[in-house]
């Protein structure tokens, strides 16, 4: 392959890549000062891959830190396309995610659940993994480069974490059994919002 042919194929590939790529920002999470941004690459007419991340950076919520980061890999399927515009609409997609957190459970939970986090300033810090499904719908706007995307996702969240008091000392569920990590698993809705998307 000569240099001219290689350069032509290189430019053609990246032209197609960028023509089928969307960047996104979650308008709903932005309202609560939690940035959530993503990028979606069209793999074929009905399939796409999305990578998105979100984070919070609050040092003091009810006397405790509230810091989280999440990243999700998602494979999307668009079962139906609008015939006139070949416009993607409803989608469903399995996802796998990873997160880190340092936070306190809300007071309304600690008042009804038996937990070591009742003391002011106490918090938990750890890692979690997500396995689930996302459902959503793209809503076209007048400007063809922009769309709105309504979505919600949930599944299972598996966590490994430690409890700490406000001085930063470890709290154990059972002082006689000092585990390296506490573990928990829940089935819940853990992502969603309204994305503003832009086609590059």
Outline where the language-model segments fall.
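Outer-membrane beta-barrel "beta-signal"
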Residues: 72-77, 186-200
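Bacterial Sec-dependent N-terminal signal peptides
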Residues: 1-22, 196-200
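Short loop/turn motifs that connect adjacent beta-strands in outer-membrane beta-barrel proteins
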Residues: 46, 80-89, 140-148
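Transmembrane beta-barrel strands of outer-membrane/channel proteins
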Residues: 25-29, 41, 51-55, 92-100, ...
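Short glycine/proline- and aromatic-enriched beta-strand/turn motifs that initiate or cap beta-hairpins
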Residues: 19-73, 197-199
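Extracellular/periplasm-exposed beta-strand and loop segments of Gram-negative cell-envelope proteins
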Residues: 26, 53-71, 101-129, 158-170, ...
């Amino acid at each position: 392959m000569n240099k001219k042919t290689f350069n032509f194929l290189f430019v053609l590939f990246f032209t197609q890549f960028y023509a089928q790529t969307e960047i996104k920002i979650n308008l709903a999470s932005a309202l609560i000062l939690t940035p959530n941004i993503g990028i979606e690459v069209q793999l074929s007419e009905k399939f796409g891959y999305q990578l998105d991340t979100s984070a919070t950076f609050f040092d003091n919520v009810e006397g405790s830190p509230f810091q989280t980061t999440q990243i999700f890999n998602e494979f999307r399927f668009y079962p139906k396309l609008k015939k006139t515009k070949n416009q993607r609409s409803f989608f469903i997609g399995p996802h796998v995610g990873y997160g880190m957190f340092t936070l306190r459970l809300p007071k309304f939970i600690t008042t009804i659940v038996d937990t070591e986090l009742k003391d002011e300033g106490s918090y938990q810090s750890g890692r979690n993994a997500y396995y689930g499904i996302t459902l959503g719908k793209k809503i076209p706007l007048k400007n063809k480069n922009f769309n709105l995307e309504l979505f919600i996702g949930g599944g299972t969240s598996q966590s490994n974490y430690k409890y700490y008091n406000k001085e930063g000392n470890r709290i154990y569920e059972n002082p006689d059994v000092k585990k390296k990590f506490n573990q928990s698993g829940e089935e819940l809705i853990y992502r969603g919002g309204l994305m503003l998307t832009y086609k590059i």
